[in-house]
Amino acid sequence: MLKVNNVFGSNPNRMTKLEDEHYFIDDIVSIKNRQKSKMYVREGKRIGHGSFGTVTQSILSSNSIEWLGPYAIKRVVKSPKVQSLELEILQNIRHPNLVTLEFFFESHCTTKDGGHLYQKNFVMEYIPQTLSSEIHEYFDNGSKMPTKHIKLYTFQILRALLTLHSMSICHGDLKPSNILIIPSSGIAKVCDFGSAQRLDDNTELKTYFCSRFYRAPELLLNSKDYTTQIDIWSLGCIIGEMIKGQPLFKGDSANSQLEEIAKLLGRFPKSSIKNSQELQDSLNDQKFKKFMHWFPSIEFFDVEFLLKVLTYDATERCDARQLMAHEFFDALRNETYFLPRGSSMPVHLPDLFNFSASEKRALGEYYNLIVPSLD
């Protein structure tokens, strides 16, 4: 069970604006030692915004002379009506494929009408590139993302999901813009946990969340009987987008989204179909041919991998462990280099198999199938 340390106290900081466009926070908390300190914050350009709030490139200083950073500060409005796991996750889970939280603080400011706005501020490592922008870098220039890059980013996303799912946490809004990447090294990190949920018996589950293009069929049907496998569906949509250069399914409503999905997967299956193995085999064969048509440039094992991810029945979707062991990732197990975009020199792959003790426990019997053989 994750726990949030109550380090803020009862009085959030009032951001004191100084003359040279930085402000002073007298109660900022370091994640490394959980100690409070006083720091100056200077915000630069805005690098993200949405219904959640804003993200700005920022630097910090204890004396307004020597500055640390850059960092990314995500500022969200604090609401008693909205319970978020974001701080719990960022504060308690340290993982190479999850964005790192460095500091955090609460603040408040006065609105134009004289009211008060209370905010949470997450000071995170600064990684300016997203998987979404990387996809556009390739396809806007008339090229395609290399297969090895697709597999490299996919494996790291799965590794992040393995950790979250082993704690019964679903991310809830997995999409290319929520995957930070460092193209020169091939590193990928999942970010934005504002929609994350803990799926246990004591949680009242919501049904309207996750960006529509990446929303699992069970969510589109307003089912409350869902699992962490909704993230696996979203991952399948992300893989398809890396292959094709645009979202796989682009509906403008829940119903039209299901219609778009049906163009690839066929109509949503009736329960009676499961009782006919012959019919099921026929449908699977048709689906495989349709996948080959939609993704003509990928190989047999890659199509088979997608079939294990993009399936209506959540119980038939492979989980993170099973997918990490798939032949789809053999190129990452058998080779040690990749060629970054725009580079003529190969570089070492990031360390993909440096699993922690908790990851090894979560992998269980799959561990030996995932790590490269010593032969």
Swiss-Prot record:
Matching entries from Pfam families are given as: Pkinase
Domain (Protein kinase): residue spans on this chain: 41-329
**SUPFAM superfamilies xref list:** Protein kinase-like (PK-like)
Key words, A-Z:
ATP-binding, Kinase, Nucleotide-binding, Phosphoprotein, Serine/threonine-protein kinase, Transcription, Transcription regulation, Transferase
Q: Which GO terms describe its cellular component?
A: nucleus
The PTM Phosphoserine maps to S211
- EC no. given is 2.7.11.1
Q: Where in the sequence is the signal peptide annotated?
A: none
Q: Which reaction is the catalytic activity of this chain? A: L-seryl-[protein] + ATP = O-phospho-L-seryl-[protein] + ADP + H(+); L-threonyl-[protein] + ATP = O-phospho-L-threonyl-[protein] + ADP + H(+)
On whether Transcription is a keyword of this UniProt record, the answer is: yes
Which molecular-function annotations from GO does this UniProt entry contain? Answer: ATP binding; protein kinase activity; protein serine kinase activity; protein serine/threonine kinase activity
Binding residues annotated for ATP, in chain numbering: I47, G48, H49, G50, S51, F52, G53, T54, V55, K74
Q: Which residues cross the membrane?
A: none
Query: Has the keyword Plastid been applied to this entry?
Result: no
Biological process, per Gene Ontology: proteolysis
- Active site annotation, chain numbering: D173 (proton acceptor)
Q: Which family does it belong to?
A: Belongs to the protein kinase superfamily. Ser/Thr protein kinase family.
Q: What is this protein called?
A: Glycogen synthase kinase-3 homolog YGK3
